[in-house]
Amino acid sequence: MAVMNDNKIVVYQVLTRLFGNTNTTNKPWGTIEENGVGKFADFTTKALEELKALGVTHIWFTGVLHHALTTDYTAYGISNDFPAVVKGRAGSPYAIKDYYTVNPDLADDPTQRLEEWEALIARTHQCGLKVIMDIVPNHVARRYESIAKPEGTRGFGEDDDTTVQYAVNNNFYYNPNEAFQLPEGIYGEYHEFPAKWTGNGARASKPDRNDWYETVKLNYGVRPDGTKDFVELPASFENEDTEAHYHFWADKTVPDTWRKFKDIALYWLGKGVDGFRYDMAEMVPVEFWSYLNSAIKHQNPKAFLLAEVYNPNEYRPYLHLGKMDYLYDKVQLYDTLRNIVTHGHSTDAIAPIQHNLADIAHRMLHFLENHDEQRIASPEFAGYAEKAKPAMTVSTFISESPVMLYFGQEVGEKAAEVAGFGSPSRTSIFDYIGVPAHQRWVNNKRFDGGQLSETERSLRNFYQRLLNLKVNGAYIDLHQYNRQHTEYYNDRVYSFARGNEDEQWVIVSNFSEHDHFGFDLQLPDYLLGSWFLNDGTYTLTDALYNEKHTTLQIANGKGRLRVDIAPLESLIFKISKLVDS
């Protein structure tokens, strides 16, 4: 298992093409000329320094790879894509067309697009930040065409036997003698023969419009009947390190797709990328991840590897056998916190999640927003950004795990625009569009928040304070104990402790929009014993704003902490000194 850092990892996901776009036209289905686009160059040293000051340690630059799009770059030797199999005008960042170069939209000079990306990598490193980019292993654009691949490299599908449905070294699955047909309701011109299976696994030559019809499924040596055409890992290898995994695969024959992706990952590591976010990782066999990740760690032991995995039953296999560093904590913590914020569900649901994940909690990435999820401030989620402050506090501090925010989240972006293919409530990843609240922070590329409202400025200040606060030590639930033993403590509040012998923290969040609460929070004797706290009175100060103070009374091994908490407030108390004993 990798130990990634000494401090909290804070990932900032940014849709690269939207970050520096200052155009406010926001015409539905607008072209790049009408609605504008951001560039690599927009990530200036000033912008990067501001992100670092926010508390960010890693930037996930989303949409860097050259994906299918509708803008014409034939003057630069790039073939046009067929609009019928491109979602939106700007295209999906997850329909990769060429893994060895980057999106020409993002370059001031498309002929220098790779060099401009390399310059941004260097600039990011100079500001003390790490660079993460996507790898999308499950599928590629319907018309994959790598014009930038290194000499001697073969592109996906170039050597496939298209007369058979499956062959172990084919990169795609085929329906021989059948032509691809566009889904019902999707119009335009596109020819593909024979038809390939669609990215989400749909096998029909005419997929449904809700299928991932703009992509094709990659073949990892899994036969159509689900059996595997490769060596499986011994179960004991969940306890082996990445070097043991690397040596395991050294003399094994693996499917061609595996080798191609290893070459791709090592290519980008060689360009200075610090790690990868793997799209839909659980749709690819865990053995492949052992093969790929052990090769990556062999080249760069500190590489950051984050996987989008949604099935809790797959968490441990993908961590221990697949050698991921971190996984999304979406269907448990995110979904639970969202239900508390949106629907007023009980906070009693939080503690069991941490209990069930106790052995891997530090490897579950927490977030409240990303490109797939609705914006907090949208009516579909919270309606206004401040309502999720307690959830963000819990998400950030409940464990040592990394936390992620999505650009614009820190200023309350609502994503209310009708962009085109994308719908309001999510910032569109498919369209040329502006991000209004974020643009007010960008302030004509001054990156100083000069156009933010006072409310937006205050929210960003909250995030900056939160993300720069270093809370260490083991997690101990206080909620269940106080639900049983503390008068006036209730399920609109959540409390927990973090700490060790050297530093101790008590964190309380109030999820109620309207109600103040007051109670004497009880700290159980086993907690006080583990912290070696003697009887007496201790002072506590809220470390978030340094304005609220309280005392912890310990007598006969039992502790009581007075808490008076306002609606949507979080108190992060650090136990500092013994007043008397």
Spans of model-derived segments:
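C-terminal beta-sandwich/jelly-roll accessory domains of carbohydrate-active enzymes
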Residues: 512-581
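Substrate-binding cleft/loops of secretory-pathway carbohydrate-active enzymes
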Residues: 141-151, 286-298, 309-341, 414-421
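Short, acidic/polar
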Residues: 37-51, 253-269, 388-392
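Active-site neighborhood of glycoside hydrolase catalytic domains
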Residues: 216-315
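N-terminal structural segment of carbohydrate-active enzymes
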Residues: 1-130, 138-149, 153-170, 176-188, ...
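The substrate-binding groove and active-site-proximal loops of carbohydrate-active enzymes
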Residues: 21-41, 95-114, 218, 235-257, ...
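Hydrophobic faces of well-ordered beta-strands that scaffold small-molecule active sites
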Residues: 10-12, 59-61, 131-133, 276, ...
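Loop/helix patches that line or flank the sugar-binding groove of alpha-linked glycan CAZymes
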Residues: 22, 69, 84, 311, ...
